[in-house]
Amino acid sequence: MHEDAPKMSIAQSLAASTSQPKGDIVTEIPLEFAMSSMETKSIETTNVELKITYVDPTTGTGGEPGAYLPTAGTVCDQTDTKDVIEELCPVCGDKVSGYHYGLLTCESCKGFFKRTVQNKKVYTCVAERACHIDKTQRKRCPFCRFQKCLDVGMKLEAVRADRMRGGRNKFGPMYKRDRARKLQMMRQRQIAVQTLRGSLGDGGLVLGFGSPYTAVSVKQEIQIPQVSSLTSSPESSPGPALLGAQPQPPQPPPPPTHDKWEAHSPHSASPDAFTFDTQSNTAATPSSTAEATSTETLRVSPMIREFVQTVDDREWQNALFGLLQSQTYNQCEVDLFELMCKVLDQNLFSQVDWARNTVFFKYLKVDDQMKLLQDSWSVMLVLDHLHQRMHNGLPDETTLHNGQKFDLLCLGLLGVPSLADHFNELQNKLAELKFDVPDYICVKFMLLLNPEVRGIVNVKCVREGYQTVQAALLDYTLTCYPTIQDKFGKLVMVVPEIHALAARGEEHLYQRHCAGQAPTQTLLMEMLHAKRKS
C-alpha cells in the first residue's frame, strides 16, 4: 500500500484561499518558485490601539471599551474601596447587592434562601435535578435553585429562626478578610497586566493590521467564590469549597470499554459542546455545572471566545478515524509507520487550513505564513494530542478494521514511543495547572505566531499578534484561576518542553525518511526538509 499522499505543497495549500476561479487555465509552477513567489492579496495596514479595559481602583469605573490602562503610577498606590470589583451572584448571575448568609449574592436569591429556610419549604424537581439556573429562569425550579444556593456556600445557620430582619452577624470578620483578599487579587491582576504592557513599550499594545478586535475588552467580571470557606480554611490556602467554585477544565472521561474510540465520540469538545462550562466533567454535580454556565461565560474575553470557536474537535476525530478506516478496509495487514505518516500528513493539511483562516495569520503574505508553519507544525501537533487526551479522552491505542492495533500515543509523539513517560509527565503538569480549552488555543496561537522565526518579513505584525494573544491569556488566567499562583508563567515554562518532544519526533521522522522508510512527495516530508534548509 505504498501509495503517495496528494502531491500538494504548503504554498499551494496556503494559496487555496486566493486561488483563481473555476474554469481558468492554471499552469503548474515548480515547487521552489511557488514557495518563494506566491503571496496573498496585499492588505493595507493600519495601527489600531488594543483597548484593554481598565477599572480604576479608586472609583470602580471604567470597563467600557476605550478605558485604557494608566500610563503612570502603580496600582499598589491606589486606596481600597468597597466597589473595586463588580460582583455577580454565583447562583443566578444577577448583580450582587451585598453579603447575605455567608456569601455575596443578589437580593432575589437572598430573599429566596431566607424564605425557604424560615418556612421550612420542601421542593421537588420535575426534571432530573440538573436545571439550569440563571437570572432569566431562576424561578422555574426552586429545588435546583436552593440546591445551588447550598452548593455555592450560603449558610443555613446564618438565617434567623425568629423571622426578624437581619441575619446572625457572626460572619463579620470573614467578610473583612474576604474584602482584603479580593482587593489584593485585583492589585495582582492589574500589576501583572501593567507589567506586561510596560514590557511591550510605553505605547501599549498596538495591532498593526486590520482586525475585528480593534476594541477588545479583556476586563472580566469577577465573583469571589465561596467566602465562607475562610472560616475553616487557613488564610494561606483556599478551602475545598473555594476550589470547587473555580472553573474546572473538562476532566478526561473513563477509558472506553471497547478498543475502538469512535469518530462520533460524545466527549468531543466541539464549539457546540464547549460553552465555557464543565459539561465534560463527569464528576461535577448538576448544580456546580449550572453554576459554571451562569458565571464562567462572563469571565471569558470576546477574543478568546472567538478563538475557541476555531477549535473543531469533531472534525479532528472524524478525519483521524475516517482515514484509519479507509486505509485498512479490506486489508489484511498494513505498514503502521506508513499509516502514521499518512495521518500526520492529513493533520498538517488541517493545520494549514486552520491557520490561514485565523484572524492574525491570514493578513500575512504567503512567504511569512510558510515560514511560521514550517517552524511550528510539529509542536502544534504535539499540543493537539495533549489537548485531545486531556479534554476528549483520546486513548493510547485503537483497533483497526483488520484487527491491528494503532498506537495513538505514538502518533502524538511523532513516532517515538520512548518519549511516552515524558509526554505523560507533561500532561500531568498541565492537569495541575487546570489546563483548559482557552489555555490550549491561546498557547497554540503563541506557538504559531513566533516573532523569532528567521526570515519572516512582517515581523511587526507577527509580534503584535503574539503579544495580543499573550495579553489575553494572561488576563484569562489571572481572572478565571486566581488561586493558581502564576498560572500564566508556568504555562509559558511548559512550552519549551513541548518543543523538545516535537524536535525529537521530527528528527526521528527525518531519519526514517532518509532511510527510505517513509512516503515521499508529501507535505510532511516537505516540512521536514524546509526546516533543515532554513
Curated annotation (Swiss-Prot):
DNA-binding region(s): which residue ranges? Answer: 86-161
List the InterPro entries hit by this protein, alphabetically: NHR-like_dom_sf (IPR035500), NR5-like (IPR016355), Nucl_hrmn_rcpt_lig-bd (IPR000536), Nuclear_hrmn_rcpt (IPR001723), Znf_hrmn_rcpt (IPR001628), Znf_NHR/GATA (IPR013088)
Instruction: Outline the residue ranges of the record's NR C4-type zinc fingers.
Output: 89-109, 125-149
- Report the coiled-coil segments: none
Q: Which family does it belong to?
A: Belongs to the nuclear hormone receptor family. NR5 subfamily.
**PANTHER family, alphabetized:** NUCLEAR HORMONE RECEPTOR FTZ-F1, NUCLEAR RECEPTOR SUBFAMILY 5 GROUP A
Question: What does the UniProt record say this protein does?
Answer: May play an important role in development.
What protein is this chain from?
Nuclear hormone receptor FTZ-F1
Annotated gene: FTZ-F1
